[in-house]
Amino acid sequence: MRRAALVLALALLSLATAPGAAAAAPKVQHLSYRYGPLTITPGQNTISLDGDKVPRPKVPGYIVGFRPNLVRVKGGVPRVDVLHLHHAVWLINGQPTFAAGEEKTQVSLPRPYGWRHDPADAWVLNHMVHNLLPNRDRVYLTYDIDFVPDSSPLARGMRTVQTRWLDVEGGSAYPVFDVHRGSGRGGRFTYPDQAPNAYGDGPARNRWVVQRDGVLVQTAGHLHPGGLYTDLVLQRGGRRKNLFRSRAKYWEPAGAVSWDVAMYATGRKWRVAVKKGDVLSVSATYDSGRASWYESMGIMPVAFAPGVKGGADPFSGKLDRRGRLTHGQLPENRNHGGERGGLPDPRALPDGPGASAPLAISDFLYGQGDLLRGGAASRPPVVRAGQPLSFVNRDASRDIFHTITACRAPCNRQTGIAYPLADGPVEFDSGELGFGPAGFTAAANRDTWATPTNLKAGTYSYFCRVHPFMRGAFRVKQ
């Protein structure tokens, strides 16, 4: 009896101490970080590179999930038609590892994979926060990390992944391309496949040659409005296989025209065995039937486990290509625009003065013909057929970029994430008038532009792609 009682007492003691032991050896930690505060200047659309104390886990382990966001210092997530997270890229030891665009894709790796983390790693943050309004603001870049510390029992079975950055304009700090309305085939345009001479005389920039056998574990695409999907393709000798199509899911009532979107990522069972010498490539497909899409992107970061065995033979037919949405609809994306506003229809306005000198853009206003100015200042300036109308951006001295981009008349409705669009009956776009470091800026590195000289008689509406509340018009006469 005494022995039985002793055994029972020891059993009860072990049950009592078990929760404490589990708490001392956590499995997955959910950590929240923020970088900033960042002061956002009026109309800002510049790229910054910061290596100053980017927060990260303080102990070694594995990062298995990453969820980015943008929040105001005073609290709350800003609307996307007010402040737009164009991109944030977390570079670790010089390599792009985690990233965010305005679709705010959330990454979660299947077990037992993770990014190896050492507190001594060098973290640098490349970020571009786009202010669509002429106001100052202050924000934090936030990111929630799912983390397996080395003290966790899960750490013993973890397998290390690396991010392989596949980009249709790989190697560029601002990797963009233009999609012109009517380009491609059947209202769709795929870059670089349908771009004439996409890379000039240089090598293809959308490819990566596998240097070591291993397993692909996860991927998801990054697109801009108008984007439909990205494709990840493997080539082995003379054989090709589409490994995954990352589709864009739009909640936007107007269709594929806004940031009211989420991307499909690979499913939890997606694994692809790759061999040294395999070539992976990425392409991006956009809707080219409705509007033009300037400064578009197509990126697919891939989590790759080198030296790991397993995964499906890409040519076996056993690859699970079903995707999963990384998140649902976000409330900051619900101001769509397009409602009737108080701006005039420029087609009904009397002629403005003849344009003999460049029209100055200053303080977020176009010179003559700005619809927000009212009165005589809103009347479209007149230029004779065959003659250009010139613009100069006086705000460029304050690092504020503006465009003159054709939109469908009257182009006078309320601004939102889906309005206005670059859908004028005649296409023209100035690029972002302003200056910045070559290759590291959205700016065109000029502050002047002139309209095409082949425009027919009529009234032409335009807006600023950087600050879409800005609207203007001009008139061509014989």
Positions of PLM-derived features:
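Bacterial N-terminal signal peptides
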Residues: 7-17
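Positively charged n-region of N-terminal signal peptides that target proteins for export
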Residues: 1-4
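Beta-strand-centric surfaces of beta-sandwich/beta-rich domains
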Residues: 24-215, 220-340
